[in-house]
Amino acid sequence: MIAYNEAEKIDAAVSSVLWADEIVVADSGSTDGTAERATALGARVVQIPFQGFGDLRNKAIAQCTGDWIFSLDSDERCTAPVRDEILALIANNPPSDVYRVPRRSYMMGRWIKGSGWYPNFRQPQLFKNGAMRYTLEPVHEGYENLSGKPIGVLANAIWQFPFRNIEEVIHKMNRYSSLGVPKIAHKKVSMASAFGHGLWSFIKHYIFKKGFIDGWAGFVIAFGNFEGTFYRYAKRYEQNQNWQPPQSEPLRRENR
């Protein structure tokens, strides 16, 4: 489990995996008591400086000693059906060494059905120790299946609570847009293309991925994707322009 300043979420996340043989929390210098709360619940907390999500996840799984690893983020919760499915699976010589886990996400007072959020998958979250590693992108990192076997999919879903409020949506879009700038460093960008990419992201999530079925929550998700995409390209454009403010001369009282 990776965490940074997640004191309000870490208790529930750790408590949902108390059935595991060990719980490893990779903390990146939290200042809000996240590490202390995780330790109090029995987790082993290791401090790993943040140098991108791929790097952080690889260093976190290197701390795990079990035969199987279940990767859970601090905004996710394991459910009883997933717990039971995992325990039954690993006890019976499963056909795959790497499994994806569906997620059911909650936002603005409702379980989200559209926007591409259900079922929602990220990188495989259940895998044999040594069967998978993450690529080193700073955000939206990929993965490599090292097992040589097909990737399986669990039947049951974990829960995800990605945002407590709109402020967190804005904060995440700002942070992720900055982390995503290096991924488009090779592209020629303009403010017009930034708007175009952002608009397409909104249309994709709100129309084609049916965000509209979730009311205002679906609109906020789509608009958040517009913002994250637009600002990623706009920040890259800003880097290319290298704008500098005009220099001012010291002003003194004139002699009269």
Per-segment meaning from a language model:
Residues 1-22:
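Short, well-formed alpha-helical segments that are part of the catalytic scaffolds
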Residues 8-11, 32-41, 81-82:
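Acidic helix N-cap motif at the loop->helix transition within catalytic regions
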Residues 16, 27-37, 73:
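A conserved acidic beta->alpha catalytic loop
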Residues 19, 40-42, 122, 147:
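Short, structured coil segments at secondary-structure junctions
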Residues 20-21, 42, 64-66, 96:
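Short, well-ordered alpha-helix to beta-strand connector turns
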Residues 35-63:
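Conserved donor nucleotide-binding strand/loop of the catalytic core
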Residues 54-61, 68, 72, 79-243, ...:
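Catalytic-site signature of metal-activated, phosphate-bearing donor transferases
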